[in-house]
Amino acid sequence: MNKIINNVFAREILDSRGYPTIEVEIELCDGAIGRASVPSGASTGKLEALELRDQDEKRYCGKGVLKAVQAVNGIIADEIIGMNAADQNAIDKALIELDGTKNKSKLGANATLGVSLAVAKAAANSFKMPLYRYLGGKQTSVMPVPLINIINGGVHADNKLDFQEFMILPVGAETFSEAIRISAEVFHNLRSILKKKGYSTNVGDEGGFAPNIESTEEALDLIIYAIESAGYSAQSDFALGLDVASSTFYEDGIYEFESKGLTSEELTEYYCNLVERYPIISIEDAMSEDDYEGWKLLTAKLGNKIQLVGDDLFVTNCELICKGIEEKMANAVLIKPNQIGTLTETFAAIEMAKSNGYKAVVSHRSGETEDTTISHIAVASNCGQIKTGSLSRSDRLAKYNELMRIESTLGKDAKYYRGLAWVL
């Protein structure tokens, strides 16, 4: 009986952009407490679960979350107080049924996710287990390759770059801690290079630099120069990744990219050319979420060569992932818990991807908090990849630091992910 939920409390806090988000605390009868806060995205998929905002322009420019807070402290608390926190499936089923909508629009996915994560943390604390072990079991040991965003563009930065994220993947590291060290060295070398060239070294939402450079190729060239300046190889030590966020520049069947209007076929050829010229092994949201034919074409062309990640295409939703698998769109799924709204549904999406030969990449959002749950999800699921921003801004570093703690705790049992070797 000591795992029974005794108290539920939610409050409004601020995320990394200074906008409100929800934080939830769950207390069990044995005194164990779990606390979780929920992130928020800037570029969002059309079919994501709803993030409930107050729309009261007199508070926080309409972005308050008091409605979500009230839902947790009222109807949700009434439902789950007295339930067993160790039965995550039952808790999440109750949340889904209480909401009763397909996209969590009644209670808000921010409310349901905050509760779902806090319950899991409370149960883990009650069992005196780290969250990754509680969620993943004894076989949990794989440390993820980080996809580290070191140049920001698109809606994450105020510059001319259309692509949203330019990432380094430290695939040649022996351990996660080494991966972070060598990536930090590249990050600081890039800062010095940008400064010498007269570019701004201010950072964007996710901690990457946001210089006002002119083209995708220039960004990639700068990153390769930074890798080599740090004493590493862009062939064996590091690979490159992109988050194109192409839905943000897609309209009426045309991609408005770098002052050119490109068809799906033309954009696919552009990607093929980039992959030939640069050590790119992962491209996210290369086509718009609405451009199914473009996705099929791209996957046919590059799907056996590099990782093609669907974010807006799948929004961590098993129904959409199943459709993508059936129609041969992409070969990897980005996993964002707040796109779906419960921990159970998050793990179901990961399992659906993995069981069908798709990779899974656990991800943050551009508006983050100091919450480190996604670090534990990445390890618990053995998915092998995590995307959680750059090597600046404490909201991003919190996740990396937590992963280094986990690796230290695992000791010799920790295994750095090698599942990206097929694309090298």
Curated annotation (Swiss-Prot):
Q: Which CDD domains match?
A: enolase (cd03313)
Record key words, sorted: Cytoplasm, Glycolysis, Lyase, Magnesium, Metal-binding, Secreted
The protein's superkingdom reads: Bacteria
One cellular component term from this protein's GO annotations in UniProt: cell surface
Report any one BP term from Gene Ontology: glycolytic process
Q: Which EC numbers does the record give?
A: 4.2.1.11
Where along this sequence does the record place binding of Mg(2+)?
243, 284, 311
Task: Identify the Pfam families for this entry.
Answer: Enolase_C, Enolase_N
Stored InterPro entries: Enolase, Enolase-like_C_sf, Enolase-like_N, Enolase_C, Enolase_CS, Enolase_N
Q: Which cofactor does it need?
A: Mg(2+)
- Give, as one word, the top-level EC class: lyase
Q: Which residues bind (2R)-2-phosphoglycerate?
A: 164, 336, 365-366, 387
Q: What is its main location?
A: cytoplasm
Catalytic reaction equation(s): (2R)-2-phosphoglycerate = phosphoenolpyruvate + H2O
Please name the pathway. Carbohydrate degradation; glycolysis; pyruvate from D-glyceraldehyde 3-phosphate: step 4/5
Compartments where found: Cytoplasm; Secreted; Cell surface
Entry annotation: catalytic residues: 206 (proton donor), 336 (proton acceptor)
**Which positions carry the signal peptide feature in this UniProt record?**
none
Q: Does the keyword Secreted apply?
A: yes
Note how many cofactor molecules are bound and how.
Binds a second Mg(2+) ion via substrate during catalysis.
Q: Which GO terms describe its molecular function?
A: magnesium ion binding; phosphopyruvate hydratase activity
Q: What PANTHER family has UniProt attached to this entry?
A: ENOLASE
Family per record = Belongs to the enolase family.
Q: What job does the chain carry out?
A: Catalyzes the reversible conversion of 2-phosphoglycerate (2-PG) into phosphoenolpyruvate (PEP). It is essential for the degradation of carbohydrates via glycolysis.
Q: What is this protein called?
A: Enolase
Its source organism is: Wolbachia sp. subsp. Drosophila simulans (strain wRi)
